[in-house]
């Protein structure tokens, strides 16, 4: 399951790269697989989370606290993109928006072992359709 999830995510990164460059600039590059974010340039960090559900299936969508902390600590403009089955949505990450997120322990159990961590749960109404 883990390998399938990685392949699913990498495919979405490749499929959406042109669209992301057209929105955020031609200098955007795709980062290495072990990087904390999926795309960047000198001034911006972009993380893409691909989901297997529609936008409104759940009231929130989650992302690891570590990713958000990394983005905030970078001093760069930081964007999270959520690729739902029915559309691509975005949110710009800044300290003011974090107050609207809920931080709690979460994770998944469907890949053979528990994967638990601290996650921010972002209310979907804060996301903008692209």
What would you call each of these model-derived segments?
Residues 1-31:
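Acidic-basic catalytic patches of nuclease active cores, encompassing PD-(D/E)XK
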Residues 22-25, 41-44, 74-77:
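Short glycine/proline-enriched coil/turn segments at helix->beta-strand junctions
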Residues 35:
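Beta-rich catalytic cores
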Residues 57-80:
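Short, charged, amphipathic alpha-helix that recurs within catalytic cores of restriction-modification
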Residues 72-97:
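Nucleic-acid nuclease catalytic cores
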Residues 89-130:
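Intrinsically disordered, low-complexity terminal regions enriched in charged/polar residues
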